[in-house]
């Protein structure tokens, strides 16, 4: 074989190797975001485990562990949406619907477990009214979860967004009596089919740094006060009250003043779940 032929053959092999390497690299690059997408969905699915262990703790009458699992579920729920948007999971893993996945988990961790918690730890009246009120909360929450207009375009919720996983631990740690607890639950449930605005703790741009700070302080306070039970903590109790008042206050402000940041009242499904 002539020198030119050898050179040509060598060049061909090098080109083929380069093309093969490029193809492998491109394939790996394509697989990489898919792997990230599956990781995000798996992280979201951890909320189901939090729900299972939380429900077991309620059944065992272990309120400290139950609140801990609810808190962990809240952290997962707060982070998975950010990760899903960052890694574009809808594009890279379209066979899994993150909205449906989160909706299923939220129904357990945000509604079922908190309602069972109230019944198990006698937070509601001991007579049949307790079961009736719990049933009303479940019914209204199921209807809210099915709303097609859960959120406005500026990311405020229409009606109370089933955040019973925040309300119930707060009322429990405040040692609220059964009937005041029942009245608070009824009032919140009654708003669920209205267009009264409630603040999304992560997505509303207006006051976002303050909102995130208030939410983190509330969560830390819940964990610290739960660990210290049955001791009372007046400062902690004041912080527990401040967070719901802030959320309700911003909701009242938004309801009265209308959309923020160029948003409008256009209804859309909630993005709290994706």
Question: Each predicted region: which residue ranges?
Answer:
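Hydrophobic alpha-helical transmembrane segments and immediately flanking/interface helices
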Residues: 35-36, 126-145, 199-206, 250-260
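C-terminal membrane-associated helical module and adjoining short loops/tails
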Residues: 2-27, 157-274
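Lipid-exposed faces of alpha-helical membrane segments in multi-pass integral membrane proteins
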Residues: 43-49, 69-72, 76, 108-111, ...
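Cytosolic, membrane-interface loops and tails of multi-pass inner-membrane proteins
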Residues: 20-31, 79-98, 155-158, 162, ...
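Active-site-proximal cofactor/substrate-binding loop regions of enzyme domains
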Residues: 30-86
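Helix-coil boundary and interhelical linker segments in multi-pass alpha-helical membrane proteins
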Residues: 53-68, 108, 114-133, 171-182, ...
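Multi-pass membrane catalytic core of lipid/isoprenoid biosynthesis enzymes
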Residues: 40-45, 86-144
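Short, amphipathic, aromatic/basic-enriched membrane-interface segments that mark the entry/exit
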Residues: 32-42, 96-104, 150-158, 201-208
